Amino acid sequence: MEIKITFTGGKKVNAEIDGMVIPTDQPRKYGGEGSAPTPYDHFLASIGTCAGIYVLSFCEERKISTDRISLVERFETEKRGDKVVLTKIILEVIVPPEFPEKYHNALIKVIDQCAVKKTIMNPPKFDIKTIVK
């Protein structure tokens, strides 16, 4: 897999993958236009959206409507020196009262299959190089 990163002006940096563009920008207070999520926002959103696709698939397989199902992702942080560090990611699956109770724990288990979560739990090695072409 290859993702091409391009610079499109100002503080905008895009990722191009499989013919699609994922735009990023920085907030105005950091010199950007605030026209797109930051790379870190995309990273955090990838956790919730990955969990979401597993919940969606689970419900589709059982013909359960997702019209009133949502996920909420929240975070706990801690100040360490001059930095704020992410210490906990909280995912809540909000289901309507008629959602079958027998599937409550199954939703948690299916979210544990999320590839993004698995990658965070077992981080890869990074190999960063400068190449002159």
Language-model segments: residues:
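Extended beta-strand/beta-hairpin segments
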Residues: 1-45, 56-133
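Alpha-helical metal-binding/catalytic segments enriched in His/Glu/Asp
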Residues: 50-51
